[in-house]
Amino acid sequence: MVRVINADPEMGTSLTEGEAKEFMTNRTILHLGTVDSKGEPSVTPVGYYFDSDSNKIYIPTHKNSKKVRNLSNNKIVSFCIDDPNPPYKGVRGKGEVSIHEEIDYNRLIAEKLLMRSLGSIEHPTSKWLLGEIEKGNEVILEISPRYYSTWNYGKAK
């Protein structure tokens, strides 16, 4: 169970834990915040896979990406998944990241992400990503969230 906080108690209501999980399961883009060695923030939109049973968030990325370099200094990240269309709602939070380099494990996670986002592992983008994983060029970031801060302006006060 992850602690759920109301992000804007003055205006909107919070999503329940179940609503937050459903929302995270059905979205495709997450904004990932890391901090570089100079202490400067970096926010990147990424595709992700959310496992609602474990509350883990998985993100494929190149092993030499700025995200991975930043995580070598600081394993704590922030994230935001939101709907830019009214009624606005979303989930943001903070968590600790583990970096997975195991090809078989990474392929399994990537296939789940690709089936959800592209509908097929035969899609050209799917084939490219899975090929990069097989070459060992891609890693999987696993976020263990500490909390969710949620908002739902569709249920405004």
Where is each model-derived feature located?
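Short, basic/aromatic recognition patches
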Residues: 3-31
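Short beta-strand segments
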Residues: 28-63, 71, 77-81
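Short, solvent-exposed aromatic-acidic interface loops
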Residues: 61-66, 113
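Residue-level preference for beta-strand/loop junctions
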Residues: 26, 40-42, 89, 135-137
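Short His-centered aromatic/hydrophobic patch
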Residues: 85
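A solvent-exposed, acidic/Ser-Thr-rich amphipathic alpha-helical stretch
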Residues: 55, 88-89
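Alpha-helix boundary recognition
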Residues: 24-25, 72-73, 114, 134
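Charged, gly/pro-rich active-site loop segments
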Residues: 1-14, 90-157
